[in-house]
Amino acid sequence: MALARTERQELEQTQGVVFNVQRMSMHDGPGVRTNVFLKGCPLRCGWCANPESQQMQPELMLRAGQCIDCGQFAESCTACMPAWQAARRRSAIQFEAIDDRIHLCPTGALNWVGEWRTAGDVMAQVRRDHPFYGDGGGLTLTGGEPTLQPAFCAALLRLAKAAGIATAMETCGHTQWDIFAALLPLLDVLLFDVKQLDPVRHLEHTGLDNALILENLRHAVATGATVRVRVPLIPGFNATPEDVMTLVEFVQTLPGPVQAIDLLPYHTLGKAKYAALGREYPWQEQPRLSLQQVEELAAIVASRGIAVTVGG
């Protein structure tokens, strides 16, 4: 996909809010991936592993375990934690003075998460991994929900295509269809999260019902796009054999095949991030699934003739 010089320059100047670029990943798409994490998400899943992705704006995080009470920056000291948490609830604009002093934190306990970056800047980082992609690897847009920043997504994907880099995007599915329709031709793989088919339970535990999500999944499959359905296996929410069979039966009603179903076992790696954001972890933990239980759920998917992976 060749780009004219002026078109490339315009794409490279497109801006978005990025909170992480994970290089050399073996997850979130085939082969070796460079995962670009974008801020902003319409859902509020209780088990979210990346709570720092939910708000669109950059946020302050304080990792108390790294704080050494140096006194160089009062807001970073655990002795001042109550005052910091109160300040944390104010808008990011009121942190402008703090932004100038964050470098004083000697351990990195206090830091901003999320920054405005240009597509050209991000792609310069992505291209460093290009030699390792081989036949299957490439760029994955994730988050957060990438489609909340559609112009930035389109710029990154078009620049990647122009560089001969394969593309993928993970989505929660809750966005306007015309945004999906514009991005799908730029994607080699769409990683589509399906968390729960029951609309009431979906609303209760994510903050939104699933009608638009499932409608968009049907539309995406109908276009002939390569779609992988991704399911976070959350004990107490969607991780029983009955839940998985219901999902499989739904997938078989779609207007075309999916490439695979990826089962993603629940973990608590995001729990410390809630504390760093001054928020309580909202999910009431239950015993994790054993390896045998996960394998049994995968076998249910395979028994209906659908390719399945564990871990994504």
Where are these regions (language model features)?
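Fold-independent oxyanion-binding glycine-rich loops
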Residues: V21, P51, A64, G108, ...
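Short cysteine/histidine-rich metal-coordination sites, predominantly Zn2+-binding motifs
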Residues: M61-Q66, A86, R90-D99, W116-R127
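Short glycine-enriched, charge-decorated loop/helix-capping segments at active-site entrances
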Residues: L62, L203-D209, G278-Q286
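Flexible, acidic/Gly-rich N-terminal and inter-domain linker regions that tether
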Residues: M1-A74, A83-W84, V310
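Iron-sulfur cluster-binding cysteine motifs and their immediate structural context
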Residues: G46-S53, G71-I93, D99-E115
